[in-house]
Amino acid sequence: MSNLAVKYKQQAQEEVQIQTPPQQMVQPKAKAKITRIEKLLYVAFIGFLLYACVAFIGNKAGLYQVNVEAATIEQKIVQQQKENQELQAEVEKLSRYERIAEVAKKHGLEINANNVKGLK
């Protein structure tokens, strides 16, 4: 019988070993911690990007405003040139010899060829 008791003990030990498989030591992976300096650098970089975006948009808005003003000034220049041409045509029309002679006769003046000087 002692043999049976030994067999029973061996079976119990085998069952215990079967039930509990050998545990592997799982090493937890260490998280890569972000240091304060890295956080500061990330925040500074994001801040710089935001500043660059705002500055870029501001410059574009300023450039648009300057272009609008330039177009307005060009329009005024064209209008002034057209007005100058019309006034120059009127000056040429009013300074014709026939018109001056007619106004002179109307006021009782006579043309004396010796006193006439050409101007240009």
Curated annotation (Swiss-Prot):
It is found in: Cell membrane. Residues 1-36 are cytoplasmic. It is a single-pass type II membrane protein. GO terms for cellular component: cell division site; plasma membrane. InterPro entries: Cell_div_FtsL (IPR011922), FtsL/DivIC (IPR007060). Residues 58-120 are extracellular. Keywords: Cell cycle, Cell division, Cell membrane, Membrane, Transmembrane, Transmembrane helix. It comes from the Bacteria. Belongs to the FtsL family. Essential cell division protein. This is Cell division protein FtsL. It comes from Bacillus anthracis. The gene is ftsL.
